[in-house]
């Protein structure tokens, strides 16, 4: 598209402070923890005079409050806002800091445009006081050439999978409880991902006496991930809130149905009864019932999987790029939002 893109982000030990990746000029400052506190100073010292047309801020956990910077027209890119869910994962002081940092968004960003990755995130912004007309919803894409179906490798016996971080707020405990409640003969649950909540989840599987049918795979590589998505009869997702269910779309592109909580963000990545099923968040019995239903109807797994694959093809990175470019051009042309 002929654009010049500069990325300012956090670094990690031994990471070079500057790099050019796929034509993008990358500036790394601080670490994941310190970046929010160092970004402003770095910007004003090294980038503020670079004559950018637009500054896009990824508003994630701790806002940078770029409207207080010396900067061009701005767009706030919002995956999702934590709100009260921060208290489910973080210690009270840290959760309170995240919650408080999000509170002044409508005031401080009152002249800025926003790009939300889901309608749920847009609605969250509106509830907090951001005008609806200042928000453009642009869904992320999925590489459907990378994630592809292969029904020939589907597990012969019911196999369910969870893929994602093992964090308390992700609701993986609900997935294990539902699997235990379903009590499907010969069924297995494979959990892929890492996190400090793993030991507690392993204890839960022992308490529920399903530890011999629940496998914790840890962090897996991409090829193993693709194989798991293809083998599973359904993936399970029970988070109370997400910006977007990217794992659900990866499963869909792989021809695998999804059983997920009817939660903000997640509900937009599953078409209930078409590509999988949505159940009330926290309703273990409802999730277990859907698992039982699929286990008794293998042909339904393939039917939902085929529809899921078709659904996933609607979400391309080309479309996301074109919509984002159009939005940024519009904001630059009108000089932001007033």
Regions found by a protein language model. Name each.
Residues 219-220, 227-232:
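Short alpha-helical donor nucleotide-sugar binding micro-motif in glycosyltransferases
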Residues 115, 151-179, 190:
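Conserved donor-binding/catalytic core segment of Leloir-type glycosyltransferases
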Residues 240:
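Aromatic "clamp/platform" in nucleotide-sugar-dependent glycosyltransferases that forms part
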């Amino acid at each position: 598209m002929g654009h010049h893109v500069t990325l300012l982000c956090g670094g990690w030990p031994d990471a070079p402070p500057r790099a050019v990746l796929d034509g993008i000029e990358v500036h790394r400052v601080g670490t994941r923890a310190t970046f929010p506190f160092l970004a402003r100073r770095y910007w004003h010292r090294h980038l503020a005079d670079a004559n950018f047309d637009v500054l896009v801020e990824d508003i994630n956990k701790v806002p940078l409050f770029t409207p207080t910077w010396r900067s061009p027209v701005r767009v706030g890119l919002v995956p999702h806002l934590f709100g009260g869910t921060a208290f489910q994962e973080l210690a009270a002081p840290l959760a309170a800091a995240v919650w408080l940092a999000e509170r002044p968004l409508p005031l401080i960003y009152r002249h800025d445009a926003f790009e939300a990755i889901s309608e749920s995130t847009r609605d969250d912004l509106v509830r907090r006081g951001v005008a609806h007309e200042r928000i453009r919803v642009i869904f992320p894409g999925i590489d459907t050439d990378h994630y592809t179906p292969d029904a020939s490798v589907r597990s012969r016996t019911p196999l369910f999978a969870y893929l994602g971080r093992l964090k308390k707020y992700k609701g993986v405990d609900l997935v294990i409880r539902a699997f235990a409640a379903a009590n499907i003969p010969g069924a297995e649950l494979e959990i892929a991902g890492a996190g400090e909540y793993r030991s507690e989840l392993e204890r839960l599987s022992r308490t529920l006496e399903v530890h011999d049918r629940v496998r914790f795979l840890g962090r897996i590589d991409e090829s193993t991930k693709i194989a798991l998505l293809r083998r599973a009869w359904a993936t399970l997702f029970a988070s109370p809130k997400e910006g977007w269910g990217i794992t659900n779309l990866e499963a869909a592109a792989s021809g695998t149905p999804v059983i997920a909580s009817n939660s903000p963000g997640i509900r937009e990545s599953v078409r209930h009864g078409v590509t999988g099923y949505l159940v009330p968040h926290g309703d273990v019995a409802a999730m277990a019932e859907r698992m039982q239903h699929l286990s008794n109807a293998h042909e339904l797994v393939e039917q939902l999987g085929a529809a899921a694959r078709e659904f996933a093809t609607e979400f391309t990175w080309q479309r996301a790029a074109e919509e984002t470019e159009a939005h940024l051009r519009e904001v630059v042309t009108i000089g932001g939002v007033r």
